[in-house]
Curated annotation (Swiss-Prot):
NCBIfam families: PRK04337.1. Pfam families: Ribosomal_L35Ae. One of its GO terms (biological process) is translation. One of its GO terms (cellular component) is ribosome. Keywords: Ribonucleoprotein, Ribosomal protein. PROSITE patterns: RIBOSOMAL_L35AE (PS01105). InterPro entries: Ribosomal_eL33, Ribosomal_eL33_CS, Ribosomal_eL33_sf, Transl_B-barrel_sf. This is Large ribosomal subunit protein eL33. Gene3D superfamilies: translation elongation factor selb, chain A, domain 4. Belongs to the eukaryotic ribosomal protein eL33 family. One of its GO terms (molecular function) is structural constituent of ribosome. It comes from the Archaea.
Length: 90
């Protein structure tokens, strides 16, 4: 059985003139390197709205940088209130 990890949404995936609310950069606790983050690719991520309880699911698609952050693609775009909130990894 896999352990549940908690992470924090750092930001949307951004370009010079655009941002993509469907893809987010997330840092998980205990993940400190690119190789550790690469082991999370393909796993499911769940964000739950703190007030309404609405759930948006996503999937880890790639690493981001060399310090353990990952890029997650969600099924729907996340609201701006989601930035800085917690997600769980299954």
């Amino acid at each position: 059985m896999s352990e549940v990890k908690r992470g924090v949404i750092v930001n949307y995936r951004m370009g010079r003139h655009t941002q993509d609310p469907r893809q987010c950069i997330i840092e998980f606790e205990g993940v400190e390197s690119r190789s550790e983050a690469a082991q999370l690719i393909g796993k499911e991520v769940i964000w739950k709205h703190p007030e309404t309880g609405k759930v948006i699911r996503g999937k880890v698609v790639d690493t981001h940088g060399n310090n353990g952050a990952v890029r997650v693609r969600f099924e729907r775009g996340l609201p701006g209130q989601a930035l800085g909130t917690e997600v769980t990894l299954k």
